[in-house]
């Protein structure tokens, strides 16, 4: 099975609880104004990577994986296979989607149902640039909701009240940025020029 991938950060603390393997899918049918990853909207682009190769990139010691985009549920079959394999390894799964949970649960395709079944934390709803969220860590706008689909995580965990973080990595002549800055720094972050790396590059948590 091949996954159409825009970006991977093998180990990050800026995309969910604990140290996580973060993967951004290439392609999204939604067009949220102010999307922080407009280069990930087109389904053409990115890299087609075998599921086994993606799993081989997950380093030891991470707590879980986070799936972003693009739109993970536009790649439900591959995303579900990755999430299932991660859960079999004892890893948690966090998914950011621009769709609403209710709409996803109403879908009839088995892949979407399986992806939901393998998800511990679902952040749903389209990003709204007019409603930036500065109170909840990792969440782009106040209309987006956090669903704890398993008992593995809790809403009262202090990690959700901490400040957003931005990670910057220098890889040769490239700067790789991921995460989401505090609101006052957003303009500066948006103004940066970022160059794509082979499978790891700038991304944000908004959908």
Regions found by a protein language model. Give the residues of each.
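Receiver (REC) domain switch/active-site residues of two-component response regulators
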Residues: 120
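Conserved Radical SAM active-site core
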Residues: 3-7, 19-20, 37-114
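Glycine-rich nucleotide phosphate-binding loop and flanking beta-alpha elements
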Residues: 31, 73, 129-130, 183
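P-loop/Walker A phosphate-binding loop and immediately adjacent motor/lid segment at beta-alpha junctions
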Residues: 74-94, 132-174
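N-terminal [4Fe-4S]-dependent radical SAM core
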Residues: 1-24, 29, 33, 37-43, ...
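Short secondary-structure boundary segments
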Residues: 97-98, 125-127
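Charged phosphate-binding loop/patch that engages nucleotide di/tri-phosphates or the phosphate backbone
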Residues: 163-207
């Amino acid at each position: 099975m091949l996954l159409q991938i825009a970006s991977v950060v093998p180990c990050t603390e800026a995309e969910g609880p604990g140290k996580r393997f973060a993967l951004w899918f290439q392609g999204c049918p939604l067009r949220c104004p102010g999307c922080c990853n407009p280069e990930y909207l087109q389904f053409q682009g990115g890299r087609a990577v075998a599921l086994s190769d993606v799993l081989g990139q997950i380093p030891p010691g991470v707590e879980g994986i986070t799936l972003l985009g693009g739109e993970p549920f536009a790649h439900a079959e591959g995303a579900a296979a990755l999430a299932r394999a991660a859960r079999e390894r004892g890893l948690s799964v966090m998914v950011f989607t621009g769709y609403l949970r209710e709409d996803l649960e109403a879908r009839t395709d088995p892949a979407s149902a399986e992806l939901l079944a393998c998800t511990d934390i679902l952040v749903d709803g389209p990003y709204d640039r007019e409603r930036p969220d500065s109170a909840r860590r990792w969440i782009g706008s106040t209309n987006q909701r956090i669903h704890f689909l398993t008992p593995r995580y809790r809403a009262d965990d202090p990690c959700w009240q901490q400040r957003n973080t931005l990670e910057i990595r220098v890889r040769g002549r490239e700067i790789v940025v991921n995460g989401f800055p505090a609101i006052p720094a957003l303009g500066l972050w948006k103004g940066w020029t970022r160059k794509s790396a082979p499978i790891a590059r700038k991304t944000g948590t908004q959908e």
